[in-house]
UniProtKB/Swiss-Prot annotation:
Source species, domain of life: Eukaryota
Domain F-box: residue ranges: 1-49
Annotated protein name in UniProt: Putative F-box protein At1g57580
Organism of derivation: Arabidopsis thaliana (Mouse-ear cress)
InterPro entries associated with the record: F-box-like_dom_sf (IPR036047), F-box_dom (IPR001810), SCF_F-box_component (IPR050796)
Length: 346
C-alpha cells in the first residue's frame, strides 16, 4: 500500500472501521506516519463513518449494550460495577451518572473527568434520575470558537434550551439573558403518533412515522417565520406485519435512522417477544438489520447514535490537576469498562 497515491490510500483507510484503523497504526509505522502527517485526516475520517448504537435501560442499569456499525452480530455488552445512567451524548463525548458521580468521557482519546455537581439541584440523589429527571438534562459541545471548544451540560440551539410542548409550540430559554420565549409553531398536518424530536448538526429535527412512510422535518426560520419543512420521506418497509407487536423510531442523526421493532414469536409451548433493530442509511437509501436486542433487556431503553471524535475539549483534555485520569486508572473501573466496550480492541 506504500506505493499507492495518497488520495487512493486515504479512500481505502476511510472505509476501515475505527478499531481496525487503530490496530493498523499499531502494526504499520508507514501508515501511522501517513495518518498523523496528513492534514485533516482525522476530521475527514470521522465525518464519513456511520454512527454505532449505544443503549441502556432508561432508569439506569449496570449493563450497557453496544452495536458496532456494519456488524449485525449480537451486541457487545459490559457490566459496570455500579449503577449507570447515560444522560447524553455529543461530539464523541458521553455524559455519565455513576453511583451519584457525574462524569464526561471520550472513549476514543481515553480521557474522562468527574464533575463537581454539589450545587446542582438536578443530582441530589440517584432517586431523582429514576423519576424521569434526566429528561430535562441536555448535553452539548459549544463550538462557537473552533479553537477552544468546551462542553456544557445543556442542550444548546442558538444560545437557548428548547422544549417541545404538547400543542407543537416550542419554549426557548436563553442561557445568557435567562429569559424564555414562546415560538408559536404547530405540528405538521401529517403528524403521526410515532414521533421523535431531536437535533441534527445543531438544527432542530422532527421525525413523524407511520407503518408505511417516515417523514423527516427540519425547523426553519426560527427567529422570523418559524415552520417545519419536510426534507425527506423514507419508505417504512421493514415491519413484519403478521407478527408485529409494537415499533418505535428510536434515533436519528442525519446519516442514519434507527427503528426498533418488537415481534411476537410463537413456538409449540409458549409465546415470547423479540426486539429487532433496523437501520436506514440515508446515503445509500436502504434499510438493513442492525441486530437484535438481548431478551433480558427491559422494554424501556435509551438509544444513542455514537460517533467517536478525536477533537480536544476544554475541561476534558486539560492536563492540569488530578481530575483527569489515565484510562487504565484502577480507581474508576466502571468508566474504564464503558470506554473499552466502545473502543476496546478484542
Amino acid at each position: 500500500m506504500d506505493t499507492l497515491p495518497h488520495h487512493l490510500l486515504d479512500e481505502i483507510l476511510f472505509r476501515i472501521d475505527h478499531r481496525s484503523l487503530a490496530m493498523i497504526q499499531c502494526t504499520n509505522r508507514s501508515l501511522q506516519s501517513h495518518i498523523s502527517k496528513t492534514p485533516n485526516f482525522a476530521s475527514e475520517y470521522f465525518s464519513r463513518i456511520r454512527s454505532s448504537l449505544l443503549y441502556i435501560a432508561t432508569h439506569g442499569c449496570p449493563l450497557i449494550c453496544y452495536h458496532l456499525y456494519g456488524d449485525s452480530r449480537s451486541p457487545r455488552t459490559v457490566e459496570t460495577l455500579t449503577q449507570c445512567h447515560i444522560l447524553g451524548y455529543c461530539s464523541g463525548l458521553l455524559l455519565l451518572f455513576l453511583n451519584k458521580n457525574l462524569c464526561v468521557a471520550n472513549p476514543l482519546t481515553k480521557k474522562f473527568r468527574f464533575l463537581n455537581h454539589s450545587r446542582s439541584k438536578f443530582f441530589p440523589t440517584d432517586f431523582t434520575l429514576r423519576g424521569g429527571r434526566q429528561q430535562v438534562i441536555g448535553f452539548a459541545v459549544d463550538q462557537t470558537d473552533r479553537t477552544t471548544p468546551s462542553f456544557k451540560i445543556v442542550n444548546i440551539k442558538e444560545g437557548a434550551v428548547h422544549w417541545l410542548r404538547n400543542d407543537g409550540s416550542i419554549v426557548a430559554f436563553n442561557l445568557k439573558t435567562e429569559k424564555a420565549r414562546l415560538i408559536p409553531i404547530r405540528f405538521p398536518k401529517e403528524l403521526c403518533l410515532k414521533t421523535l424530536f431531536t437535533a441534527v448538526d445543531n438544527n432542530l429535527t422532527l421525525i413523524s412515522a407511520t407503518e408505511e412512510v417516515i417523514y423527516v422535518y427540519a425547523f426553519h426560520n426560527i427567529l422570523s417565520d418559524p415552520k417545519w419543512v419536510l426534507v425527506k420521506q423514507i419508505r417504512n418497509g421493514v415491519l413484519d406485519e403478521k407478527r408485529l407487536y409494537s415499533w418505535y423510531v428510536e434515533a436519528y442523526d442525519g446519516k442514519s435512522l434507527v427503528l426498533r421493532e418488537t415481534i411476537l414469536k410463537k413456538d409449540y409451548y409458549n409465546k415470547h417477544l423479540k426486539q429487532v433493530l433496523h437501520g436506514y442509511d440515508l446515503r445509500a437509501n436502504k434499510w438493513e438489520v442492525i441486530g437484535s436486542i438481548p431478551e433480558w433487556s427491559p422494554s424501556g431503553l435509551d438509544f444513542y447514535q455514537f460517533t467517536p471524535s478525536p477533537s480536544s475539549v476544554i475541561g476534558l483534555d486539560d492536563k492540569e490537576g488530578e481530575e483527569i485520569l489515565a484510562c487504565d486508572d484502577k480507581r474508576i473501573p466502571s468508566v474504564n469498562a464503558i470506554m473499552r466496550l466502545i473502543y476496546g480492541i478484542s
